[in-house]
Curated annotation (Swiss-Prot):
Residues 639-782 form the TIR domain. Its main location: membrane. Belongs to the Toll-like receptor family. InterPro entries: Cys-rich_flank_reg_C, Leu-rich_rpt, Leu-rich_rpt_typical-subtyp, LRR_dom_sf, TIR_dom, Toll-like_receptor, Toll_tir_struct_dom_sf. The gene is Tlr2. Glycans are attached at residues 147, 414, 442. It is a single-pass type I membrane protein. This is Toll-like receptor 2. Changing residue 681 to H: Abolishes MYD88-binding and response to microbial cell wall components. The chain crosses the membrane at residues 588-608. It comes from Mus musculus.
Length: 784
């Protein structure tokens, strides 16, 4: 029993593991181009079922601890393999043996405590290799990279354990586009370790201390074009002459990111510049300066050796005692030939006038995200300041008056571009003064509600994005580019305001439509961005977009950013795909069609009414309604006649001379109702007919050819027809005065025709011997 129980649990475990593996295999998704994504799928091993069709495989963020020699054998055409953060601690020596086409390999942030050169031997096509973030101390016993002749990007090292860089580490590498070394725990650097790489375009060094900086600098001086130092504490850096002969260093850019400096160490760093004669750009990002700016270069030749530095960039510089900071007079001469300076988000509130006057070559100055106000700006832009300045960026400072700002900058005679965006200005005045050469003005995110003539007429580029504008009516004759996105405009501005406009960006406004005429009114417009507006997909707009395939040449964000906001049935549809309904877009044609159809219907109904005696049925309905208002059966006291005689005027001789004489002079006599004698004068004929029939016990119809042609006889027959069949009253007596064709009786009297087929009627005999019998039968019928 116990054995069976163990066997059961083993089978359950195998089933669970197999189902998990199958589920994992199913979650590996590949597209038609061979790019497979297996990120964060809880794989515990390389998935099976890999094929030669795969070009890219990403298995990052899994739990793969081991890569065996056969796991990737099927991926002969694989070009990209990403195994980042997958807990890998063991890789077989020939695991990558079949990956001769591999160009990109990422093994970063795993648990590889040692590296093997056998992994990389077959990877002759490899261009990118990332080994960063693994807990190894060195790069292995032998050189890892002698066969990687095509390698362009290499990332190595870690934060805590990588402690030694040796000569053999980079043997075989002669040229790299990018080399990144994270060695924050570096304890030993073997001289000339990096010297074997003759050409490095961009070298990034993560060093916590500056102990080995001079040795490394000496090795890379002749090979690196862009050196980036990260997270380095340079507070204790001391310069000493480098053990190198005169060399022409190709280094163009030097960057410090996250570094710590002091006034003294800054002076020491300046001494390095004598070895970098071609240096043109220096950058400080997220650095800390523990000092007061008391820079005092001790060697006079430093000044001359800074001659080719044209760009200085400082971002987010933290100076704990910035309010005590010096005026930098000691470095004025160092920056005389600099053309571009950026000091961003560094609590700058003043550039001393004398410093500004020394920046004679400065063409570009960016003081974004600082503390500048008009009073201090006036001191900075004093007479003679920045004489060559063409572009000034004062974005996100504390400027308030547009008028004062313009007047202060009048001293900058060569200023052509001004960015004062993200300042909170007071309402725009009607007039302002600006430098006469100004061509570009950025007023985005300044909260302006109205654009006035304060804006200079000389502008070629104007940016008023992200404000509260609901209209734009300023004439700018030279304007070529207008950026007015994220406002409240409901339509495109009038084209006559910008006769030479080339580019307009009006995204995220309240524009509901635009037309062919509107776009055509801009004679030189080449680019329009009007997406993400509240478009009303009217017939005119949709018709225009469907009939103008060249829109994609002008609308750079067409078609994905152009969506219908209304009507509701088209909400969210692209203008390109939306189709208007016939009811909305062809109302005139639709109304015309409906009217024509209605007219045809009326004609058809009229023809049918004529053919099927519709008017007669209407008259019959009227008579029926009239009769319904009266009691269904007249009281006995209202029945005044034994019979109402309905006859044609042409048959009056027979009725008056024969029928009346025979019936009214009989014993007992019958009282007959004749229209000539008994109708009430002045009363409507139809009312007389109805009343006479209702007051008569019977109705005698004297049928003849004349009868069926008589109009009034038809009315009498109509109402009798109603009385006969609506009241189930057998009150009609048919007297056939002369033989008539049955088809002469109108089709509408279908029941009357049926009676003539099913019931006996009296026929006037021409034989005088039979006429007495006829009268006897008629009297009997009236009495019944």
């Amino acid at each position: 029993m116990l054995r069976a129980l163990w066997l059961f649990w083993i089978l359950v475990a195998i089933t669970v593991l197999f189902s998990k593996r199958c589920s994992a295999q199913e979650s590996l998704s590949c597209d038609a181009s061979g790019v497979c994504d297996g990120r964060s799928r809880s794989f515990t091993s390389i998935p099976s079922g890999l094929t030669a069709a795969m070009k890219s495989l990403d298995l990052s963020f899994n739990k793969i601890t081991y890569i065996g020699h056969g796991d990737l054998r099927a991926c002969a055409n694989l070009q990209v393999l990403i195994l980042k953060s997958s807990r890998i601690n063991t890789i077989e020596g020939d695991a990558f043996y079949s990956l001769g086409s591999l160009e990109h390999l990422d093994l970063s942030d795993n648990h590889l405590s040692s590296l093997s050169s056998s992994w990389f031997g077959p990877l002759s096509s490899l261009k990118y290799l990332n080994l960063m973030g693994n807990p190894y101390q060195t790069l292995g016993v032998t050189s890892l990279f002698p066969n990687l002749t095509n390698l362009q990007t290499l990332r190595i090292g870690n934060v805590e354990t990588f402690s030694e860089i040796r000569r053999i580490d980079f043997a075989g590498l002669t040229s790299l586009n990018e080399l990144e070394i994270k060695a924050l725990s570096l304890r030993n650097y073997q001289s000339q370790s990096l010297k074997s790489i003759r050409d490095i375009h961009h070298l990034t060094l993560h060093l916590s201390e500056s102990a080995f900086l001079l040795e490394i600098f000496a090795d890379i001086l002749s090979s690196v074009r862009y050196l980036e130092l990260r997270d380095t504490n340079l507070a204790r850096f001391q310069f000493s002459p480098l053990p190198v002969d005169e060399v022409s260093s190709p280094m163009k850019k030097l960057a410090f990111r996250g570094s710590v400096l002091t006034d003294e160490s800054f002076n020491e760093l300046l001494k390095l510049l004598r070895y970098i004669l071609e240096l043109s750009e220096v950058e400080f990002d997220d650095c800390t300066l523990n000092g007061l700016g008391d820079f005092n270069p001790s060697e006079s030749d430093v000044v001359s050796e800074l001659g080719k530095v044209e760009t200085v960039t400082i971002r987010r510089l933290h100076i704990p005692q910035f309010y005590l900071f010096y005026d930098l007079s000691t470095v004025y001469s160092l920056l005389e030939k600099v053309k571009r300076i950026t000091v961003e988000n560094s609590k700058v509130f003043l550039v001393p006038c004398s410093f500004s006057q020394h920046l004679k070559s400065l063409e570009f100055l960016d003081l974004s995200e600082n503390l500048m106000v008009e009073e201090y700006l006036k001191n900075s832009a004093c007479k003679g300041a920045w004489p060559s300045l063409q572009t000034l960026v004062l974005s996100q400072n504390h400027l308030r008056s547009m008028q004062k700002t313009g007047e202060i900058l009048l001293t900058l005679k060569n200023l052509t571009s001004l960015d004062i965006s993200r300042n909170t200005f007071h309402p725009m005045p009607d007039s302002c003064q600006w430098p006469e050469k100004m061509r570009f003005l950025n007023l985005s995110s300044t909260g302006i509600r109205v654009v006035k003539t304060c804006i200079p007429q000389t502008l070629e580029v104007l940016d008023v994005s992200n404000n509260n504008l609901d209209s734009f009516s300023l004439f700018l004759p030279r304007l070529q580019e207008l950026y007015i996105s994220r406002n409240k405009l409901k339509t495109l501005p009038d084209a006559s305001l910008f006769p030479v406009l080339l580019v307009m960006k009006i995204r995220e406004n309240a524009v509901s439509t635009f037309s062919k005429d509107q776009l055509g009114s801009f004679p030189k417009l080449e680019t329009l961005e009007a997406g993400d507006n509240h478009f009303v997909c009217s017939c005119e707009l949709l018709s225009f977009t469907m009939e103008t395939p060249a829109l994609a040449q002008i609308l750079v964000d067409w078609p994905d950013s152009y969506l219908c906001d209304s009507p509701p049935r088209l909400h969210g549809h692209r203008l390109q795909d939306a189709r208007p309904s016939v009811l909305e877009c062809h109302q005139a044609a639709l109304v015309s069609g409906v009217c024509c159809a209605l007219l045809l219907l009326i004609l058809l109904v009229g023809a049918l009414c004529h053919h099927f005696h519709g008017l007669w049925y209407l008259r019959m309905m009227w008579a029926w309604l009239q009769a319904k208002r009266k009691p269904k059966k007249a009281p006995c006291r209202d029945v005044c006649y034994d019979a109402f005689v309905s006859y044609s005027e042409q048959d009056s001789h027979w009725v008056e001379n024969l029928m009346v004489q025979q019936l009214e002079n009989s014993d007992p006599p019958f009282k007959l109702c004749l229209h000539k004698r008994d109708f009430v004068p002045g009363k409507w004929i139809i009312d007389n007919i109805i009343d006479s029939i209702e007051k008569s016990h019977k109705t005698v119809f004297v049928l003849s050819e004349n009868f069926v042609r008589s109009e009034w006889c038809k009315y009498e027959l109509d109402f009798s027809h109603f009385r006969l069949f609506d009241e189930n009253n057998d009150a009609a007596i048919l007297v056939l005065l002369e033989p008539i064709e049955r088809k002469a009786i109108p089709q509408r009297f279908c029941k009357l025709r049926k009676i003539m087929n099913t019931k006996t009627y009296l026929e006037w005999p021409l034989d005088e011997g039979q006429q007495e019998v006829f009268w006897v039968n008629l009297r009997t019928a009236i009495k019944s």
